[in-house]
């Protein structure tokens, strides 16, 4: 008897890539038209190099919500970083909230994410958990064949 495979059982980088590929291939997630012009935070000097960064960020958010509920403010802290200020000491800056909010809204639109009943941010829905488990199972089976 084989035990069920969850997203916890596979490599996080491969899982995020596979989820992003699934989101792009499905065509249900719409990338905002401003996505090629935006930086991902005050602490960043340049815009993202990867043209599919929105799918990767949405996949990362979905994977994060698999483990625990979180809100946009928590995600801003997770994806934030040090702002380099020249000769002055670095200071922590949160990430850009609009990019995160739009990605979470797209995940809500495809029924992967729903609002927490107690108002504690967002949680992964049953449909989202089922799809992520299916992606993890396919990743694990392809890893065993290789």
Swiss-Prot record:
GO molecular function, a single term: structural constituent of ribosome
Organism: Caenorhabditis elegans
An individual GO BP term: ribosomal small subunit assembly
Pfam families tied to this protein: Ribosomal_S19e
Keyword check for Repeat: no
Keyword Aminoacyl-tRNA synthetase listed: no
The entry's keywords: Ribonucleoprotein, Ribosomal protein
GO CC annotations, alphabetized: cytosolic small ribosomal subunit
Listed InterPro entries: Ribosomal_eS19, Ribosomal_eS19_CS, WH-like_DNA-bd_sf, WH_DNA-bd_sf
Family of this protein: Belongs to the eukaryotic ribosomal protein eS19 family.
Protein name per the record: Small ribosomal subunit protein eS19
């Amino acid at each position: 008897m084989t035990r069920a495979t969850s997203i916890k059982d596979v490599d996080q980088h491969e899982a995020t890539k596979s989820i992003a590929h699934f989101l792009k291939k499905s065509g249900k997630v719409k990338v905002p038209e401003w996505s090629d012009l935006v930086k991902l935070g005050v602490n960043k000097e340049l815009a993202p190099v990867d043209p599919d960064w929105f799918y990767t960020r949405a996949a990362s958010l979905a994977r994060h919500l698999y483990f625990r509920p979180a809100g946009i403010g928590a995600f801003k802290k997770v994806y934030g970083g040090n702002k380099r200020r020249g000769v002055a000491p670095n200071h922590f800056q949160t990430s850009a909230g609009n990019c995160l909010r739009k990605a979470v809204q797209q995940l809500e639109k495809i029924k992967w994410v729903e609002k927490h009943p107690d108002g504690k941010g967002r949680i992964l829905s049953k449909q989202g958990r089922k799809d992520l488990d299916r992606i993890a199972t396919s990743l694990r089976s392809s890893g065993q064949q290789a």
